[in-house]
């Protein structure tokens, strides 16, 4: 749709070059096989936090710790704020599993001293060249929400303007 393309162009114009994907793997006779790649709302963060303990309990003591994604995500989001404004964690309020992921990210951001807000995408409002939620200015937008669900949203122009101008980072 036009709105989806406009959102993608706004992120590109705002110099957003980051992406987070989840690849689901199944173990079979011939090793691991990918069964799904989730690029729009890749969850599993909460579940992954338990993998090191489960692996160690099963006797696997070497290997790569997959839980580094939360640390790296939080570091990147905090650096994008450049010391001002909040990080808005936008999620689909109808899905408890989406809230679960965003609440985990919020908790980890707050533990590091960042201001992180949980909100639906419709809560974003224009504030000058940027965005706000309530009275809180937003400097970073983490969208854990399918782009196509934003189609026709009343505040879409405000989001597009803020992101494409670089006033709000994604």
Question: Across the structure, where does each feature detected by a protein language model lie?
Answer:
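Intrinsically disordered, low-complexity boundary segments flanking structured domains
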Residues: 7-8, 12, 157-160
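Low-complexity, highly charged intrinsically disordered N-terminal segments
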Residues: 1-7
């Amino acid at each position: 749709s036009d709105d989806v393309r406009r959102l993608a162009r706004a992120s590109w114009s705002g110099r957003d070059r980051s992406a987070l994907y989840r690849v689901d793997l199944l173990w079979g006779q011939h090793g691991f096989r990918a069964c799904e790649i989730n690029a729009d709302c890749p969850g599993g963060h909460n579940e992954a936090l338990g993998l090191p303990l489960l692996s160690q309990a099963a006797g696997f003591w070497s290997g790569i710790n997959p839980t580094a994604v939360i640390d790296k995500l939080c570091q990147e989001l905090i650096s994008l704020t450049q010391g001002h404004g909040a990080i808005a964690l936008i999620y689909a309020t109808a899905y408890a599993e989406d809230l679960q992921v965003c609440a985990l990210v919020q908790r980890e951001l707050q533990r590091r001293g960042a201001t992180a807000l949980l909100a639906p995408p419709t809560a974003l409002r224009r504030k000058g060249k940027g965005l706000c939620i309530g009275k809180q200015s937003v400097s970073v937008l983490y969208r854990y929400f399918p782009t196509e669900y934003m189609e026709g949203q009343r505040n879409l122009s405000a989001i597009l303007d803020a992101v494409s101008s670089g006033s709000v980072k994604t």
